[in-house]
């Protein structure tokens, strides 16, 4: 079991990253909430992982902290919820936001997540209620290795990097991989895009606009 990786962040192609540890590059799929917390490329990053072995593939899912990984592991125990849908849930809301939805039976917020229909949302509320009854609100302040919090890092990246239209394309592709339809992804990105935005910021704002 691979539980944690620490190494140089080589690539970010949301929702996938490539992290090099001791000369080995690991492809890891992450929820957008975790990708927002990553440092710049060529910087050291630490991610917590969940390893899945299937007949046709070996897959690594990564998270910025143990809390997100814990919720991911609870989600994939729900009947009909696989890793892809669990990642979509965590990409659209934080762990505590999801827990709040469950505790308040807020089905309207959950059905807005791509891939979650009414029946799946109802099943999530029912099955997760008992599993989350002892969940404590998590006050997590993620800090990168250079002491910069994710919000500051995103702002600095937006100011310092020269952006091209590829960022819009990357954002659209990321939304498609999360289960949104082409029309939804195009419309959401177009509605939030401003010149100079990083792909991560475009994705984050686009997701907010659809919830």
From Swiss-Prot:
Keyword annotations: Cytoplasm, DNA damage, DNA recombination, DNA repair, DNA-binding
UniProt GO BP: DNA recombination; DNA repair
Molecular function terms, GO-annotated: ATP binding; four-way junction DNA binding; four-way junction helicase activity
Name of the protein: Holliday junction branch migration complex subunit RuvA
Chain positions covered by the region annotation Domain I: 1-64
Domain remark in the UniProt entry: Has three domains with a flexible linker between the domains II and III and assumes an 'L' shape. Domain III is highly mobile and contacts RuvB.
SMART domains the record matches: HhH1
Protein localization: Cytoplasm
Quaternary structure note: Homotetramer. Forms an RuvA(8)-RuvB(12)-Holliday junction (HJ) complex. HJ DNA is sandwiched between 2 RuvA tetramers; dsDNA enters through RuvA and exits via RuvB. An RuvB hexamer assembles on each DNA strand where it exits the tetramer. Each RuvB hexamer is contacted by two RuvA subunits (via domain III) on 2 adjacent RuvB subunits; this complex drives branch migration. In the full resolvosome a probable DNA-RuvA(4)-RuvB(12)-RuvC(2) complex forms which resolves the HJ.
Residue numbers spanned by region Domain II: 65-143
GO cellular component, one term: Holliday junction resolvase complex
Sequence segments annotated as region (Flexible linker): 144-162
Region (Domain III): 163-211
Phylogenetic lineage: Bacteria, Pseudomonadati, Pseudomonadota, Gammaproteobacteria, Alteromonadales
Domain of life assignment: Bacteria
